[in-house]
């Protein structure tokens, strides 16, 4: 457990140096407890990788670990690409980023990230690798580096940003913020709790009586939407649509009926457009048909925002500004997959979007800078949205680091689905399970079958243990129980 020490503010990072001296990649194969259908993909099994770096931070040596699943059909959306190729492509960008980072020296973690980001971007452009995919690799190195820096100085993430330990400068990412300190644009304290915004996947059963005997799961966790609402006290939801108006209408009416019947009256939801539309005009027509359905009239009063309705190939076309301008009473629409580079959010705001999502796989410093930019625009009278979205995050590392950044950014409604599509930490070694329960009592609880599962009470996740950690697990993860894989790009 990290023993946080009081720190004077601000820290002077001049003369400081950060260097990555060693790294490794480990892997474990996981299976979902039920199929996760999102967009054009259905996830049933998936690799999880752990990236560990050893860093010299101002003369002190520390390690940091990051982790993520390798999800098909998200970083790239090529229907015909085999899953094996997509996994190989994801491993390629991770290996490339680590190769770029090894031996690299920066004045701070932020400075080193900037160097790595530019190198990875140059390589990606010359190799025709999409930036969203390329910087997945950057983000894994970045996360491990941030944890190492925080651990070397006994600071939690929020402290490390506001004290200047990480060297973060929002104006270096978004020039409009020049001269504004991150501490003046971010919450003064991390959130103690967040709302778990439950993913309603395209194929998820809505009621227990819809589950056939063959599909019924006997692992002590809820399976259908009504069971999840009762078990977790859920109040926030993320509902996926597929672009077919008749299917979406019937699905939304069924989802709405289930939520209204079982959830508290202060429920709220977002819609995920899953990149199903090619223009704002076509999405607006779809939206109007949904909105004009009498059975959904009161339900839509609880809408938070709409996420990425347009395909990434067209979503940031400047010509869309005219379509946005012609729709003054539009709901808040944000980007997600289109938020691929440092320039994506400013471009989206200029077109007419209300904001973006944060996912750790898109980058930590980028996400913090985006939060600062949105707060700047909010103070100038604009309605802005930064949402917290999930890419099936599970422990023992990924979901904790994800929650740490959400708490720091003050994002109160956070999509969570890793606990729903995976059976807690049941697939991990017993020692890893023990360490999680020891370090994160309150975040995890023991399931009736004896393994840790995310604790959600009254729809909320308690972040008390998360906010005490150096952006990580709070213990030294034993990587020897996982398979080490080569760092070579060959």
What are the language-model segments listed below?
Residues 122-286, 301-312:
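Active-site-facing alpha/beta catalytic cores
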């Amino acid at each position: 457990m990290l023993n946080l020490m009081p720190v004077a503010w601000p820290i002077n990072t001049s003369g400081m140096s950060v260097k990555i001296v060693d790294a490794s990649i480990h892997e474990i194969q996981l299976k979902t407890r039920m199929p996760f259908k999102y967009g054009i993909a259905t996830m049933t099994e998936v690799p999880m990788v752990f990236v560990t770096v050893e860093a010299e931070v101002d003369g002190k040596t520390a390690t940091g670990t990051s982790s993520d699943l390798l999800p098909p059909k998200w970083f790239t959306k090529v229907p015909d690409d085999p899953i094996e190729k997509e996994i190989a492509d994801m491993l390629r960008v991770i290996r490339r980023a680590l190769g770029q980072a090894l031996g690299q020296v920066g004045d701070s973690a932020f400075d080193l990230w900037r160097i790595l980001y530019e190198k990875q971007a140059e390589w990606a452009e010359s190799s025709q690798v999409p930036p969203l995919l390329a910087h997945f690799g950057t983000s894994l190195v970045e996360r491990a580096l941030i944890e190492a820096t925080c651990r070397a100085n006994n600071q939690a993430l929020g402290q490390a940003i506001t004290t200047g330990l990480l060297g973060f400068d929002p104006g270096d990412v978004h020039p409009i913020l020049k001269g504004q300190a991150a501490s003046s644009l971010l919450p003064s304290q991390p959130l103690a709790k967040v709302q778990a915004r439950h993913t309603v996947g395209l194929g998820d059963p809505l009621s227990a009586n819809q589950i056939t005997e063959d599909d019924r799961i006997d692992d002590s966790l809820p399976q259908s939407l009504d069971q999840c609402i009762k078990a977790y006290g859920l109040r926030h939801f993320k509902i996926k649509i597929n672009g077919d108006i008749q299917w979406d209408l019937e699905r939304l009416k069924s989802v709405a009926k289930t939520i209204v019947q079982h959830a508290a009256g202060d429920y709220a939801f977002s819609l995920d457009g899953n990149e199903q539309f090619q223009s704002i005009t076509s999405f607006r027509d779809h939206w109007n048909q949904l909105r004009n359905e009498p059975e959904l009239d009161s339900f839509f009063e609880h809408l938070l925002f709409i996420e990425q309705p347009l395909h990434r190939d067209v979503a940031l076309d400047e010509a869309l500004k005219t379509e946005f301008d012609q729709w003054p009473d539009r709901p808040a629409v944000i980007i997600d997959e289109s938020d691929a580079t440092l320039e994506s959010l400013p471009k989206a705001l200029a077109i007419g979007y209300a904001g973006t999502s944060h996912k750790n796989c898109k980058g930590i410093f980028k996400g913090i800078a985006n939060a600062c930019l949105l707060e700047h625009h909010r103070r100038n009278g604009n309605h802005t949205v930064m949402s917290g979205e999930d890419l099936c995050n599970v422990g023992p590392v990924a979901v904790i680091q994800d929650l740490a950044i959400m708490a720091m950014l003050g994002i109160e409604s956070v999509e969570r689905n890793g606990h729903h599509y995976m059976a807690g930490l049941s697939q991990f070694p017993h020692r890893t399970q023990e360490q999680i329960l020891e370090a994160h009592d309150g975040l995890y609880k023991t399931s009736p079958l004896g393994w840790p599962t995310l604790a959600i009470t009254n729809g909320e996740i308690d972040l008390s243990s998360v906010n005490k950690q150096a952006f990580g697990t709070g213990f030294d993860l034993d990587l020897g129980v996982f398979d080490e894989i080569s760092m070579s790009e060959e």
